[in-house]
């Protein structure tokens, strides 16, 4: 086989492998997200509408009576920042893994 033919086969194999890895990673993340959404729905079904109203009122009352309302807002912002950082880290790790695999295939 010529070097050009070998390079074409290597490039085709690498492309197919990268596509499979990307699809697998996206599929796993989709399954995790859908499973967590299903769990949230079942938990919401368990709590009746009257209980929800009482819980919201109690949480608001406790937060305002103890002066923790600003702390709750900060906690929500902190959770958003943490989740964004985790998402970015996941994407970077996936990208690094794909580049490492590509470099291994290139030097084979």
From Swiss-Prot:
Keyword annotations of the record: Fertilization, Secreted, Signal
- Give the record's GO CC terms: extracellular region
Compositional bias of type Basic and acidic residues: which residue ranges?
39-49
| Region of interest: Disordered | 39-64
Q: Phenotype when inactivated?
A: Male infertility. Sperm are morphologically normal, exhibit normal motility and can penetrate the zona pellucida but are unable to fuse with the egg membrane. No effect on amount or localization of sperm-egg fusion protein IZUMO1.
**Signal peptide annotation:** 1-30
Q: Where in the cell is it found?
A: Secreted
Q: Where mainly found?
A: secreted
Q: What is one process in the GO biological process aspect for this record?
A: fusion of sperm to egg plasma membrane involved in single fertilization
Q: Which InterPro entries match?
A: LLCFC1
Quote the function comment for this protein.
Sperm protein required for fusion of sperm with the egg membrane during fertilization.
Q: What is this protein called?
A: Sperm-egg fusion protein LLCFC1
Question: What is the organism field in this record?
Answer: Mus musculus
Q: What is the lineage of its organism?
A: Eukaryota, Metazoa, Chordata, Craniata, Vertebrata
Instruction: Identify the gene encoding this protein.
Output: Llcfc1
């Amino acid at each position: 086989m010529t070097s050009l033919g070998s390079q074409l086969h290597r490039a085709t194999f690498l492309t197919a492998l990268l596509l499979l890895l990307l699809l697998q990673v996206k599929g796993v993340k989709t399954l995790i997200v859908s499973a967590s959404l299903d769990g949230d729905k079942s938990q919401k079904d368990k709590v009746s509408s009257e209980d929800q109203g009482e819980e919201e009122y109690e949480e608001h009352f406790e937060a305002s009576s103890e002066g923790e309302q600003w702390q709750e807002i900060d906690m929500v912002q902190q959770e958003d920042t943490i989740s964004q950082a985790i998402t970015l880290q996941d994407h970077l790790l996936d990208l690094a893994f794909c580049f490492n695999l590509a470099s291994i295939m290139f030097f084979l």
